[in-house]
From Swiss-Prot:
Belongs to the acyl carrier protein (ACP) family. Pathway: Lipid metabolism; fatty acid biosynthesis. This is Acyl carrier protein. Its main location: cytoplasm. Residues 4-79 form the Carrier domain. One of its GO terms (biological process) is lipid A biosynthetic process. 4'-phosphopantetheine is transferred from CoA to a specific serine of apo-ACP by AcpS. This modification is essential for activity because fatty acids are bound in thioester linkage to the sulfhydryl of the prosthetic group. The modification O-(pantetheine 4'-phosphoryl)serine is found at S39. Signal peptide: none annotated. Carrier of the growing fatty acid chain in fatty acid biosynthesis. It comes from Prochlorococcus marinus (strain MIT 9211).
Length: 80
């Protein structure tokens, strides 16, 4: 999957999970500061990403995923 395709899929998931317009979801968007996610939203978002991309995101890694770009990079790295 290309980075653009990954970004679009992440953008769609984030938009749905956080009830924000997909246009607001940019690479630099911080889940909590920019998109209004709380800690429960973040956990649910990680679970949705794991399911959508068929990957496992350990808690330690999830703590380092603060932005949409972080999520895309992590997924790209996992899918090699």
């Amino acid at each position: 999957m290309s980075q653009d395709a990954t970004l679009e899929k992440v953008r769609s998931i984030v938009s749905e999970q956080l009830s924000v317009d997909a246009g607001e979801v940019k690479l630099e968007s911080n889940f909590q500061n920019d998109l209004g996610a709380d800690s429960l939203d973040t956990v649910e978002l990680v679970m949705a990403l794991e399911e959508a991309f068929d990957i496992e995101i350990p808690d330690e890694a999830a703590e380092g995923i603060a932005t949409v770009g972080d999520a895309v990079k992590y997924i790209e790295d996992k899918q090699g």
